[in-house]
Amino acid sequence: MYKRQINSNTFQDQPRQTHSYKFGSLTNVSKEVRNQAIKHNVECIEWGKVLGSDSLTVWIGDGSNLPGQQHFTHALERYLDSCSQIYESLPDNWQMFLEHKMFEPAFYSTVIQDWGTSVLCAMELGPKAKSLVDLGHHAPNVNIEMIVARLIQFQKLAGFHFNDSKYGDDDLDSGSINTYQQFLILNELVDAEYRKAKGFNPAYMLDQSHNVTDPIESLINSSVEVQRSYLKALLVNREKLQGYQDENDALMASNELKLAYNTDVSPILAMYRMRAGGAIDPIATYRSCLLYT
């Protein structure tokens, strides 16, 4: 679902900022620093109201680089206290998305390091708080699709930052590396739609860094690749898959997914774009437009 999302930024010091976030923002040991970070988030909500937004994403880089540098429990307590004040400022129709990340910029510990801490904090804050899944923010080889299923089951899936990665938070174009993983994630989303899962209403966003390509072209390409994964997931025969699962037929269950994944849906996507008034070949169309500007 399309949502006008506001992202706060307390992981960088801004010009004319009174206090530095070098040692944390919402979890800083200094109350003055925490209050500054809280105020920034509340201001983001106010700007969001002007822009017609309905959600605030909170990602912090707070953490530590050396053992003993930070008291794990006290840091999380400060995070919850700060977030609760932000939560109280949310309009009735807004949601608060808590974004986790395994490491970077902190390399020994990160306060909100994984989906477990994120969802525990979301449960503590209240029903308007949910966990955001950025595909590059997990530990290597983590089963992201199962995390998605768990968050859906407990009505705590906020949405996604779609991207791709090889080593960490690489923010590469969607579908450029792990296309099967992306398909499996979308398969869980389609399954939730199929089951009419309670509280299922995720936000879909792209969060990427384009250093060697035209950013517009990369965003176009990424959008197409996410659509491709979604369409392939729609082709999965849910009844057959459930039957194989009930019979403990692991091979055929896997093959049922691969049958959909290996299907070329490019013609369907092109037809969809044409019927929607879009370009059959988006990249070629965009490049042709550049010739006349």
Segments and roles (model prediction):
Residues 1-5, 292-293:
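Conserved small/polar residues in nucleotide/adenosyl-binding loops
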Residues 3-18:
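Glycine-rich, aromatic-flanked loop segments that form ligand/cofactor-binding clefts
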Residues 14-35, 60-73:
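Surface-exposed, active-site-proximal loop segments in enzymatic domains
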Residues 23, 62-66, 102-104, 165-169, ...:
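A short, flexible beta-alpha/helix-coil linker loop
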Residues 37, 43-51:
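Internal, well-ordered alpha/beta segment that forms a basic, Gly-enriched binding/recognition surface
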Residues 46, 53-54, 68, 80-95, ...:
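Histidine-acidic metal/acid-base catalytic patches
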Residues 94-103:
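Aromatic-lined carbohydrate-recognition surfaces of secreted/lumenal glycan-active proteins
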